[in-house]
Amino acid sequence: MLELKHISYRVSTPEGEMDIIKDISITIPDHRLMVFTGPNGGGKTTLAKIIMGLVQPTGGQILYNGEDITGLSITERAKKGISYGFQQPPRFKGITVHDLLLLAAGEEKLSKDRCCAYLTKVGLCANDYLDREVDVSLSGGEVKRIEIATILARHGELMIFDEPEAGIDLWSFARLTETFEQIHRDGTATMIIISHQERIIKLADEIVVIANGQIAHRGSTDEVFPLILADTLGGCPVLERKEGAQ
């Protein structure tokens, strides 16, 4: 279980202090699929980075399975089973996709077939990618899918995905949502997905709308989705439909 208690994040700007995250408290039970959504600049990514340890909060406490992890490093959190997928994943010149999957799996010895299976789950033809370097020759969407495959290979207990649909074509997007659904059905991990996409939002056990650094709405899909649509129709583009996705 993940517990955020009165999390705040403040930065200094030329105009003075600015609160990016304002006293957010939320508990996420094990094996839930949570979607964080809301307007751009509302604080979703910052909150996710705080959970992973990429950003240190200026106030509050983070508990994971009852342990205070607020001061732990990224590496220490990763060892506890927390994984993070970036909006814009890094590239690794000289490291092949196969190498990256083996590194992600850690002590688990992945067979070539297992590596191929992870790539297939994110909509990539394994034979075309396994021996390619994760460098500038790959598109942003390709690197994004490879990163998601490495997260799957880690078998983390808490998986955080920041806009996993970004730069991904419709066919691969469909495969990706199927993968999220399967992980959720298996009940092996808690997922936090930052997304504006209707199809991903509707997978959620709970939707959390974050705006202006605060939780604006939280509840089931049936409760919150109509509010998102109302905001959208009212001129606040909280939700974007992925054209062609059904």
PLM features per residue range, with description:
Residues T37-P39:
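The feature captures the beta-strand-to-loop junction immediately N-terminal to the Walker
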Residues M52:
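Helix-to-loop junction immediately C-terminal to a conserved catalytic motif
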